[in-house]
């Protein structure tokens, strides 16, 4: 996580909250003590670490539940994601299932910095290469 990453996300999202953009003001915040990454940037960056880009059984993401930003991520920190299947439910009449994934974003020290459930819609059957 670089300062340039944080500033690029601010420019893209329009979120210029002082804790992301103003070092002096961010140091005054007792929760951060300096500039930090946007929580929503962490979620987006984490998706890039676990989402398979090729066509496959996952049809769509449809939500996030129980999102908590537990610990700030600062410029220079590194993140990784731990994800595991938490719950599966079949919607047979619809031809798909719903999968709830337990996700944790973890920093270079092994501390959880964010936790949440990712909700996905997954095909019940393999989808043919050619759809008529």
Regions found by a protein language model. Give the residues of each.
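Catalytic strand-loop segment that frames the active site of acyl-thioester-processing enzymes
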Residues: 1-37, 122-124
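Hydrophobic beta-strand-centered segment that forms part of the acyl-chain substrate-binding groove
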Residues: 28-37, 41-87
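HotDog/MaoC-like acyl-thioester-processing domains
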Residues: 73-78, 82-132
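Hydrophobic transmembrane alpha-helix bundles
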Residues: 1, 57-66, 70, 94-107
